[in-house]
């Protein structure tokens, strides 16, 4: 195989055929189906969800592996391609902003003008004495998430300064903090005195915080991929587009959590 067939001779982003978008859509469908069955109390639905979630992780790993090969071995991620990927990711974050804006809209729609069915008060009758104290686990999780943002920034600037060891240390700390945050969320859910079916308050609370938790899981996967690429010398101080996208995503989750903490945990309760 000569160089003309092994490397592309243009700077543009020509998408090669890949099975992973199709497989990702399939496993996402089964994830949603399993979650719906679990909420309706179907037997063995949690096992079904676990299997489908493992399929999601496997598909993401295989897709990331192919993208890493295209970028680091095939040389497909030229400056023009990298610029296009960054613009696409920024547009994706804008769409995510509107998604969370709709959730906050639903929350304020119910809380600013509570109906008679809710007792004309917020939190609703029966929930007011069950809300989660914002100065306990939520405050700890806020500190953890903001600290993870600082350690991730440290890792980024260490990579730019060609200090691979400190970049890895910063990423290790960020990933450890992300697991602590998810553990705090799981503990909070397990001990919460209300459920997702307890009025619009419970639905808004679990939908907003749960969706944010899913974003933290996805962000952790992105950072794990970046850690692997730095560890295997695939990323340099000038070539780390995937890592930068993961950083943008993580800081986006930080900002969303601050809004969640101030509105739902403090003001809303």
Curated annotation (Swiss-Prot):
GO BP field: mitochondrial electron transport, cytochrome c to oxygen
EC number: 7.1.1.9
Translocase is among the record's keywords: yes
GO MF annotations, alphabetized: cytochrome-c oxidase activity
CDD domains assigned: Cyt_c_Oxidase_III (cd01665)
Transmembrane annotation, as ranges: 19-39, 44-64, 87-107, 135-155, 170-190, 205-225, 247-267
PANTHER family: CYTOCHROME C OXIDASE SUBUNIT 3, CYTOCHROME C OXIDASE SUBUNIT III
Task performed by this protein: Component of the cytochrome c oxidase, the last enzyme in the mitochondrial electron transport chain which drives oxidative phosphorylation. The respiratory chain contains 3 multisubunit complexes succinate dehydrogenase (complex II, CII), ubiquinol-cytochrome c oxidoreductase (cytochrome b-c1 complex, complex III, CIII) and cytochrome c oxidase (complex IV, CIV), that cooperate to transfer electrons derived from NADH and succinate to molecular oxygen, creating an electrochemical gradient over the inner membrane that drives transmembrane transport and the ATP synthase.
A single GO cellular-component term on record: mitochondrion
Protein's organism: Schizosaccharomyces pombe (strain 972 / ATCC 24843)
Official protein name in the record: Cytochrome c oxidase subunit 3
SUPFAM superfamilies: Cytochrome c oxidase subunit III-like
Membrane topology listed for this record: Multi-pass membrane protein
Enzyme's top EC category: translocase
Cell location: Mitochondrion inner membrane
Subunit structure as annotated in this protein's UniProt entry: Component of the cytochrome c oxidase (complex IV, CIV), a multisubunit enzyme composed of a catalytic core of 3 subunits and several supernumerary subunits. The complex exists as a monomer or a dimer and forms supercomplexes (SCs) in the inner mitochondrial membrane with ubiquinol-cytochrome c oxidoreductase (cytochrome b-c1 complex, complex III, CIII).
Keywords from the UniProt entry: Membrane, Mitochondrion, Mitochondrion inner membrane, Translocase, Transmembrane, Transmembrane helix
Known catalytic reactions: 4 Fe(II)-[cytochrome c] + O2 + 8 H(+)(in) = 4 Fe(III)-[cytochrome c] + 2 H2O + 4 H(+)(out)
